[in-house]
Regions:
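Residues at or immediately flanking beta-strands
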Residues: 66, 99, 231, 281-284
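Short alpha-helix boundary/capping motifs
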Residues: 111-115, 173, 236, 265, ...
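ABC transporter nucleotide-binding domains
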Residues: 3-211, 217
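C-terminal coupling/interaction segments
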Residues: 2-3, 264-314
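ABC transporter nucleotide-binding domain
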Residues: 177-263
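Short, flexible cytosolic linker that couples an ABC transmembrane/permease module to its adjacent nucleotide-binding
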Residues: 120, 222-226, 309
């Protein structure tokens, strides 16, 4: 079994609202993040991602369940592993009139980190050449990279990033994505919480999808995609009749404009053969390639606290 840097068992968090009513934010979450690579932590807004991260970092108290970081029980043992963890959970505060370098130098002195770590952090996040510019002149993407640089001053083994690309333009998203890849290549394990699924698919090696505070699926990205539905887009002269024939033939199908989409792992020849027996001739039969966003939407549709859990990890 791979070494786990993060492990939660039955993790639960219940809040009381202003009227004193209980609200479940995290409902018995079992999370396992292996060492190495980039692990996506995915879920709709309000699914419990940030609450889970805050509990792992000792910023919120769990109602019940257990948590372990590097095999150490937390929050009790958190001080012994804190130097191995870097995290960007909320927008950090930097001095606007200091340069990026000056901000990092000040923080390094506070943390007791050697001055050489400032150079390493600046280089790692790609701020070389802009590190002497004032913080207030930075773009949002550069500010996010400086925030990541600050977490690297203690040379962490685990980096936790909560929605690091929120509000960024495409160029800023690409910069953060490249930074995450570089960190992973250097041996840092990254837990990436995000809802920008196309970006996650490009950078993550594994992922956990949660909904309503509970795990819905977990595994490598390839395993998650293989576990989702596949199918074909069918172009035919009479889509209404084709939809009826396919439905009566046991296929799950739906029509969008003049195209019939069939959700099935059966061969495409089965579809064309069935249609041909009803004198429906296929003009085009195109395999549908499942992406992470499609799988995510399929998995979280109608999700409830009592919904099924899928663990596709092998």
């Amino acid at each position: 079994m791979d070494e786990l840097v993060i492990e939660t068992t039955g993790l639960r968090k219940v809040f009381l609202d202003r009227r004193g009513r209980s609200r479940v934010a995290v409902a018995g979450l079992d999370l396992a993040v292996p060492a190495g690579g980039v692990h996506g932590f995915l879920g709709p807004n309000g699914s419990g991602k940030t609450t889970t991260i805050r509990m792992l970092l000792g910023l919120a108290r769990a109602t019940s369940g257990s948590m372990r970081l590097f095999g150490t029980d937390v929050p009790k043992g958190l001080p012994t592993v804190l130097d191995r963890i870097g995290a960007v959970v909320e927008s950090p505060k930097f001095s606007p009139n200091f340069s990026g370098r000056q901000n990092l130098q000040l923080l390094a002195r506070i943390l007791g980190a050697p001055p050489t770590r400032v150079e390493v952090a600046i280089d790692t996040v790609g701020l070389t050449g802009r590190d002497r510019d004032r913080y207030k002149s930075y773009s949002l993407g550069m500010k996010q990279r400086l925030a990541i640089a600050a977490t690297l001053l203690k040379d962490p083994s685990l980096l936790i990033l909560d929605e690091p690309t929120n509000g960024l333009d495409p160029a800023g998203i690409r910069e953060i994505r490249d930074t995450i890849r570089d960190l992973s290549d250097s041996g840092v394990t990254v837990l990436l919480s995000s809802h920008i699924l196309a970006e996650v698919q490009q950078v993550c090696t594994s992922a956990t999808i949660i909904g309503n505070g509970r795990m819905l699926a977990s595994g490598t990205v390839d395993e998650l995609l293989r576990s989702g539905s596949t199918g074909f887009r069918v172009t035919v002269s009479d889509p209404d009749t084709a939809l009826r024939v396919l439905s009566e033939g046991g296929f799950s199908a739906r029509r969008t404009a003049d195209v019939v989409t069939v959700d099935s792992d059966r061969p495409g020849s089965d579809i064309s053969r069935l249609l041909a027996t009803h004198d429906l001739w296929v003009d085009e039969l195109v395999p549908v390639r499942q992406d992470l966003e499609s799988f995510f939407l399929e998995l979280t549709a109608g999700d409830t606290l009592g919904g099924p859990t899928t663990d596709v990890a092998r």
